[in-house]
């Protein structure tokens, strides 16, 4: 079997790209209403501690003045249990162009959000774990910086990793179904799993150095050589 150097090179390029992705700038704006639950405030405060210098979390009080939303904001979080200011403030944040989610204890507190849209959502929960799991999925659905977000915020890593593994599994399943020559799918699947390995390393804040990436490619090449022997 011919060793697909091109496929392995593609996997390495994907890994280098993933390393760059993990260093992308991430900007999160958090607006805290005076009615916000202390438990929700504490959960978000503990969860949004950046692990790299590429992430920045901006925090501001929600009051009668118009919310200031920087143009580079990736997502905005509004912590509130309902107030007279909430609807107008949220509208202003969305109009500024930032995907916005309101975190509350009950949907009754935020009646103007009836269902999620690409730009606006509501997560209502009194359970810290459930709140953060839902928030992780909500953000991942609305950003193209999944690796950077997960590398910075630990509560997002499981959701991001699950998506990476599922995507690789679906790719390999489709490859296996479409390739009719025995063994011909092996190089493609190996390359996909190398890429997945590098992406998972970045998601968990432990990016592989390029020397280790070439090591992994060498192991894959040796496996292919033995298979073809």
Across the structure, where does each feature detected by a protein language model lie?
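Flexible, charged surface loops at secondary-structure boundaries
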Residues: 20-25, 68-74, 94-96
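Structural motif
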Residues: 30-36, 78-83, 103-107
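Extended, compositionally biased accessory segments flanking or bridging domains
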Residues: 1-61
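Membrane-inserting effector segments that mediate pore formation, membrane fusion
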Residues: 159-229
